[in-house]
Amino acid sequence: MKTFSAKPHEVKHEWFVVDATDKVLGRLAAAIAHRLRGKHKPIYTPHVDTGDYIVVINVDKLRVTGNKAEDKIYYRHSGYPGGLYETTFKKMHARFPARPLEKAVKGMLPKGPLGYAMIKKLKIYAGDIHPHAAQQPQSLEINA
């Protein structure tokens, strides 16, 4: 018996909506990355994008445990000497509510063309309204 390998045109991508209210950042990100990658499906193939579309709402109500709101620091560099910028979780979450979850999920996905295709299937919104009603996303409960 040959090992099954999914073909890109055979894969059915479903749409799910996740409510991030009072969910822990890392646990939610791990569950979302698992779904985006398609590892929950029996047809999972490492070199084929078998994952689903995930719409995350209420990301502004996301939380972190302990003192991470003040202690967790995100770094970025401008490319110029001395151009290192530091931002705490609390500041970033207040200014760009979706960015901490996006960075967490992106770090859990593979790097390269396949990983970039997977992260494009993640849609994040601060409120409870999203423009993807036409896709009829199913509600997905993640215990994070």
Curated annotation (Swiss-Prot):
Keywords of the record: Ribonucleoprotein, Ribosomal protein
Signal peptide: none
InterPro entries on file: Ribosomal_uL13 (IPR005822), Ribosomal_uL13_bac-type (IPR005823), Ribosomal_uL13_sf (IPR036899)
Highest taxon of source: Bacteria
Record bears the keyword Ribonucleoprotein: yes
Gene Ontology MF terms: mRNA binding; structural constituent of ribosome
Hydrolase in keyword set: no
CDD domains: Ribosomal_L13
Gene Ontology terms describing biological process: negative regulation of translation; translation
GO CC annotations on file: cytosolic large ribosomal subunit
Pfam families named among the record's database cross-references: Ribosomal_L13
SUPFAM superfamilies: Ribosomal protein L13
PANTHER family: LARGE RIBOSOMAL SUBUNIT PROTEIN UL13M, RIBOSOMAL PROTEIN L13
Family: Belongs to the universal ribosomal protein uL13 family.
Primary role: This protein is one of the early assembly proteins of the 50S ribosomal subunit, although it is not seen to bind rRNA by itself. It is important during the early stages of 50S assembly.
Subunit (UniProt): Part of the 50S ribosomal subunit.
Name of the featured protein: Large ribosomal subunit protein uL13
Record organism: Nitrosomonas eutropha (strain DSM 101675 / C91 / Nm57)
Taxonomic lineage: Bacteria, Pseudomonadati, Pseudomonadota, Betaproteobacteria, Nitrosomonadales
